[in-house]
Amino acid sequence: MKKHDGIIVLLSGGMDSATLLWLAKREFKKVYAISFDYGQRHKVELKYAKELAKLAEVEDHFIVQVPFYTSLKGSALIDESVEVPKGEYPENEPPVTTVPMRNLIFLSIASAFADNLEVNYIGIGVHALDTPYPDCRPEFITAAEAAINAGSTFVAKKKERMHVYAPFLGMSKRDIALLGKELGVPFEKTYSCYMGTEPPCGECPTCIQREEALRGIL
């Protein structure tokens, strides 16, 4: 099977991005990882991201500071005055854990690294159950890819397209877990909890989704 040349993967330390990283190792010749410290309540995830990047033997792992998010209010992930909800996500509206324009900012930063590294794939692990978040929907990914291509020095010089690689868009979290099992992802070394506690709280939406997805696997 022919591999693509290079990719930079958005790596949070959770099960979705870890599975994407292992998939990228299979599908690409060179794999880079990028993680973000944006003042998140669950900053402990970065410890897991570092370990995963090391285990995956990536070319390089970049950790980028995004300090302005601490100035924003209203998101339970970056505003300590907002309580992290318990139970499942709401179905028809963005949850209180939404961080404004997070994936737009992260993809923009990752695209700058991709431009500089001259790799034309940027990997993001959004999936079908992420749709309450506006910046996890297929139409956002399509628009982000178009914007990246319009502004890329790499594209202008090399006459090649940039691609936002989002292979899980049509998959459930359970599907991702099963793929991860097939790929040998060390799920025990991933972290998903909005509270940022160790051990995880087991009650927040991402803890519940993780437990359901990994049932019988981990």
From Swiss-Prot:
Free-text comment on the cofactor: Binds 1 zinc ion per subunit.
Domain of life: Bacteria
Gene that encodes the chain: queC
Residues engaged in binding ATP: L11, S12, G13, G14, M15, D16, S17, A18, T19, L20, L21
Organism: Aquifex aeolicus (strain VF5)
Record SUPFAM superfamilies: Adenine nucleotide alpha hydrolases-like
EC code(s) of this entry: 6.3.4.20
UniProt keyword Transmembrane helix present: no
Function as written in the Swiss-Prot or TrEMBL entry: Catalyzes the ATP-dependent conversion of 7-carboxy-7-deazaguanine (CDG) to 7-cyano-7-deazaguanine (preQ(0)).
The family this protein is said to belong to: Belongs to the QueC family.
The protein, known as: 7-cyano-7-deazaguanine synthase
